[in-house]
């Protein structure tokens, strides 16, 4: 499954994996998964976290290692983001629910994920997605970026 990913995608997923893998031991635990999900405004129960881990935990050791994570991501990409998942993701970023993601909102979510970005990096991310040039990202622009990944 993961063999259909490009080198760029694998590098991106490696970066995402390290955001989850807080202690850097090469495995994601339910605790680490919970921390990241809560920082994104979700509130999963312990049982839900365990289910998520079990879904991809091929060797049954109770944690997700990078190859298992890659398989999960490859599967998720094949299902391509459903409209509902995209709306949910947009809502996570759009803190004030005004229909736009501002640079401040983008910075806030990325910082919660442990990703310290410079103002230039945040501005660059906005510029890449901001088709109409109004300095923020609307839902249509967000969908385009997410589908292009």
Curated annotation (Swiss-Prot):
Q: Which positions fall inside the EF-hand domain?
A: 8-43, 44-79, 81-116, 117-149
UniProt xrefs under PROSITE patterns: EF_HAND_1, EF_HAND_2
Summarizing the function annotation, the protein's role is: Calmodulin mediates the control of a large number of enzymes, ion channels and other proteins by Ca(2+). Among the enzymes to be stimulated by the calmodulin-Ca(2+) complex are a number of protein kinases and phosphatases.
Recorded hits in SMART domains, A to Z, give: EFh
- Keyword Heme in the entry? The reply is no
An additional note in the Swiss-Prot or TrEMBL entry is: This protein has four functional calcium-binding sites.
Q: Return the InterPro entries for the record.
A: CALM/Myosin/TropC-like, EF-hand-dom_pair, EF_Hand_1_Ca_BS, EF_hand_dom
Q: Which CDD domains match?
A: EFh (cd00051)
Q: Which UniProt keywords apply?
A: Acetylation, Calcium, Metal-binding, Methylation, Repeat
Q: Which source organism does the UniProt entry give?
A: Oryza sativa subsp. indica
The GO terms describing molecular function are: calcium ion binding
- Lineage, top-rank taxon, reads Eukaryota
Q: Which residues bind Ca(2+) 2?
A: 57, 59, 61, 63, 68
Q: Where does Ca(2+) 1 bind?
A: 21, 23, 25, 27, 32
Residue numbers carrying N6,N6,N6-trimethyllysine: 116
Q: Which residues bind Ca(2+) 4?
A: 130, 132, 134, 136, 141
The molecule here is called Calmodulin-3
Protein family membership: Belongs to the calmodulin family.
Q: Which residues bind Ca(2+) 3?
A: 94, 96, 98, 105
Residue numbers bearing the N-acetylalanine modification: 2
The terms describing its cellular component in GO are: myosin II complex
What the entry lists under Pfam families is as follows:
EF-hand_7 (PF13499)
SUPFAM superfamilies in UniProt: EF-hand
């Amino acid at each position: 499954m993961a063999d259909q990913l490009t080198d760029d995608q694998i590098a991106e997923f490696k970066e995402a994996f390290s955001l989850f893998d807080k202690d850097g031991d090469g495995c994601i635990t339910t605790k680490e998964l919970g921390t990241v999900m809560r920082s994104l405004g979700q509130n999963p129960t312990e049982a839900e976290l365990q289910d998520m881990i079990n879904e991809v935990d091929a060797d049954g050791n109770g944690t997700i290692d990078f190859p298992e994570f890659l398989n999960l991501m490859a599967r998720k990409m094949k299902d391509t983001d459903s409209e509902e998942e995209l709306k949910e993701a947009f809502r996570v970023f759009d803190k004030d629910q005004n229909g736009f993601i501002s640079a401040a909102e983008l910075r806030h979510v990325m910082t919660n994920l442990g990703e310290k970005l410079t103002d230039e990096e945040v501005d660059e991310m906005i510029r890449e997605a901001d088709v109409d040039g109004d300095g923020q990202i609307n839902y249509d622009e967000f969908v385009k970026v997410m589908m292009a990944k």
